[in-house]
Regions:
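Hydrophobic, aromatic-enriched interface-forming segments
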Residues: 167-196
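Bacterial N-terminal signal peptides
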Residues: 7-14
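Short, surface-exposed loop/turn motifs that are enriched in glycine and acidic residues
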Residues: 161, 165, 177-181, 228-235
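Positively charged n-region of N-terminal signal peptides that target proteins for export
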Residues: 1-4
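Aromatic-anchored, glycine/proline-accented short structural segments
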Residues: 185-236, 240-241
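Extracellular glycan-targeting catalytic surfaces
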Residues: 20-164, 169, 173, 196-199, ...
C-alpha cells in the first residue's frame, strides 16, 4: 500500500512537471528573434540615466491639452521603459550586460529618489513602476537587489489599486508585479481577488468601461467639446493593464481567464475590438478619435478568447502602445 501511494505521488509530480513543460507561458517563456537588435539594446548600454531626488510633476492635462513633462518625469518614464527593454533582452538572450544595465538603472532610482511630492507624480509611480518591477522579475534570479526590493516597499504606498478606474487597473498591475518581484504570495493572492473585483465593478455586462468612454483630451476630463475623443484610448489603457496582470497571475498559479470575471473581460475585448474596427459604432464617435489602435494587448487576449473583430485587427497588424514589447514575442 505504501509503495502504491508513493507511486501515485510520483505520477502526480510527473504529470505536473510535464504540464508545465507543455505550457508555453507568454512572459516566462518569452521568445523573440533579434530582440536586442530591434530594441537597439547595445546603444542603450551606453546611455546615462539621471535619477532625481524628488518627483514633482505638474498635472498631465491642462484646459487646452497635454502638458509637456518636466525633466525628472521624462527621466523616470524613460528609465522605466529602458530597464524593461534591457531586462527582457537579458531574459531572451542571457547576455549579462543587459541584465546588469537593467539593475544599474533600477538601483540608481532606488538610491536617489526620496520624495513623491504631487498627485501627478503619484500617478506616474502607479503607471511606470510595473515596468520596473517586471524588469526586476526578469533578472532577479541572476542579479538580486535588496536595494531595489526596499524601493518597491517604499513606493507601494502609491499604488492606486483600490480605484475602479484606469488608475486602479494599473494599480493592480503595480501590485501584481510587486508581488512577483518580492515573492509576496499574500499580495499576489489578494491581487488575484482584486483583479476579479475590478472587472465586475469597472466593466458593465455589455463590456463597456463607463469611466473610460467619456474621456476628453483636456483637464475637463469627462466633458467639454472633445468629450469621448479619448474614450477608446482610455478603454485600451485600462484593458492593457488588466490583460498584463491577468497573464502574470496565470503564469504564477491563478488562472482567471475562464472565471466569471474572465468572461466579463472577454465581452469587453470583443466590444472594444468592434469599436476599433468600426469607430462609428463608438457612442462618442467624432473625427480624429485619439489612441484607437493602442491595442497591442490583443496579442495576449487572443490566446485566451475568441473575437472575430479582434482577429481581423490582429491580421491587419496596426497595433500600438506596446511598451511591454508584446509584438516582438515569437509565436
Amino acid at each position: 500500500m505504501k509503495r502504491f501511494v508513493l507511486f501515485l505521488l510520483f505520477m502526480c509530480v510527473c504529470v505536473c512537471v510535464q504540464a508545465h513543460a507543455d505550457q508555453d507561458y507568454f512572459f516566462r517563456d518569452f521568445k523573440s528573434t533579434d530582440l536586442p537588435q530591434k530594441l537597439h539594446l547595445d546603444k542603450k548600454l551606453s546611455q546615462t540615466i539621471q535619477p532625481c531626488v524628488q518627483l514633482n510633476a505638474s498635472k498631465h492635462y491642462t484646459s487646452t491639452g497635454v502638458r509637456e513633462p518636466d525633466a525628472c518625469t521624462k527621466s523616470f518614464k524613460k528609465s522605466a521603459l529602458m530597464s524593461y527593454d534591457l531586462a527582457l533582452g537579458y531574459l531572451v538572450s542571457k547576455n549579462k550586460q543587459y541584465g546588469l544595465k537593467a539593475i544599474e538603472i533600477l538601483n540608481a532610482w532606488a538610491k536617489e529618489l526620496q520624495s513623491i511630492d504631487t498627485y501627478q507624480s503619484e500617478d506616474n509611480i502607479n503607471f511606470y513602476m510595473p515596468y520596473m518591477n517586471m524588469a526586476y522579475w526578469f533578472v532577479k534570479k541572476a542579479f538580486p537587489s535588496p536595494e531595489y526590493e526596499d524601493f518597491i516597499k517604499r513606493m507601494r504606498q502609491y499604488s492606486q489599486s483600490a480605484l475602479n478606474t484606469n488608475h486602479g487597473a494599473w494599480g493592480i498591475l503595480f501590485d501584481v508585479s510587486s508581488a512577483l518581484a518580492l515573492d509576496d504570495h499574500a499580495l499576489l493572492h489578494n491581487s488575484a481577488n482584486r483583479w476579479q473585483d475590478w472587472i465586475f465593478k469597472a466593466i458593465d455586462e455589455n463590456g463597456v468601461i463607463a469611466s473610460a468612454i467619456t474621456r476628453s483630451d483636456t483637464s475637463d476630463y469627462h466633458g467639454g467639446p472633445t468629450k469621448g475623443i479619448k474614450g477608446i484610448a482610455y478603454t485600451n489603457f485600462a484593458l492593457l493593464a488588466i490583460t498584463i496582470s491577468g497573464e502574470l497571475l496565470f503564469e504564477n498559479g491563478y488562472d482567471l481567464w475562464g472565471s466569471g470575471a474572465g468572461k466579463r473581460l472577454s465581452v469587453a475585448y470583443n466590444k472594444v475590438a468592434t469599436w476599433i474596427l468600426n469607430p462609428e459604432t463608438f457612442p462618442y464617435f467624432q473625427p480624429n478619435l485619439i489612441g484607437v489602435h493602442n491595442n497591442a494587448y490583443f496579442i495576449i487576449l487572443a490566446k485566451h478568447y475568441s473575437s472575430p473583430s479582434a482577429d481581423e485587427l490582429l491580421k491587419q497588424g496596426d497595433l500600438h502602445e506596446d511598451g511591454f514589447r508584446l509584438k516582438l514575442r515569437s509565436l
